[in-house]
């Protein structure tokens, strides 16, 4: 995955596409034209959707679409949700399901090697496990998840997503 606005990213997308590899946008601030160009080049997936991707924003007095809205508007682009209930709240999970549907949505744990390690000691001073998630030690940002896929399915069901659809998105 790559930020499509970075130098060489679109060439990378075209290369992946030529090899039959699914390319993904991530950690990007691309707006609609950038996402459209990225999709056409071969980035057909949005990894860790909503994470390090802005929604609509203002520049001076004008509003602009963000990466999130641009991905929603790109028919055929699939999304990946970290549905641990921490990275994304249930309202966002419902919105993504409603707009992209089961066919264009998949679940990802984003789990570090500390999956299911709540309450256990870890050997990396750069991160802590707290509140059911990995955080940077200074608590300035999330560093990953400790959720397992079954937890993601349960989180989706708690968000009123049908069990069959939650399982399909997880597989």
Model-derived segments and spans:
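Active-site core of metal-dependent hydrolases
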Residues: 1-117
């Amino acid at each position: 995955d790559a930020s499509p606005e970075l130098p060489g990213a679109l060439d990378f997308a075209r290369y992946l596409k030529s090899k039959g590899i699914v390319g993904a946008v991530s950690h990007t601030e691309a707006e609609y034209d950038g996402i459209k160009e990225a999709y056409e080049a071969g980035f057909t997936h949005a990894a860790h959707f909503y994470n390090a991707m802005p929604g609509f924003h203002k520049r001076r007095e004008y509003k602009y679409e963000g990466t999130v809205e641009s991905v929603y508007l790109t028919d055929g682009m699939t999304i990946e949700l970290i549905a641990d209930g921490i990275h994304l709240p249930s309202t966002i999970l419902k919105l993504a399901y409603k707009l992209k549907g089961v066919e264009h949505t998949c679940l990802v744990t984003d789990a570090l090697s500390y999956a299911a390690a709540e309450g256990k000691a870890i050997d990396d001073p750069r991160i802590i496990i707290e509140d059911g998630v990995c955080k940077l030690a200074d608590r300035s940002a999330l560093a990953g998840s400790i959720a397992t896929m079954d937890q993601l399915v349960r989180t989706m069901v708690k968000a009123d997503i049908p069990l069959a659809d939650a399982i399909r998105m997880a597989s």
